[in-house]
Amino acid sequence: MAGILGAGVQDGLLLKPIKYQWAMDLYDQAVANTWFPNEIQLAQDLADWDKMSDEERHAVTFLMSYFNPNELLVNKALAFGVYPYVNAAETHLYLAKQMWEEANHCMAFEYVLDTFPIDRTMSADTLPMT
């Protein structure tokens, strides 16, 4: 029986029998916790936004736009740095769900950045890299 690490191609093509129950448990938990950004009501958040100082709004804008591309970096790290090197199908399922979650986080940040009256020219993703 192959271990959990390897090329990830020849092994890991069949889900059953499950070799790593912890991976299936994580996958099941992740599926049960599925959420969608556009289902989040932001009315109270928008009201709170209006009460913030300019400095507070700038901090929120900067942090939201900073974390957004970093979610995609986590996704790429999982896709290219981990996924190809695991063999078990159940670990592939969990990693695929985790990659979806990272993309969903990115879309959540975009949803907030698009919903709030934010000047994207002042956000972290538009600042020149030094």
Please provide the spans of the model-predicted regions:
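Non-heme di-metal
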Residues: M1-T130
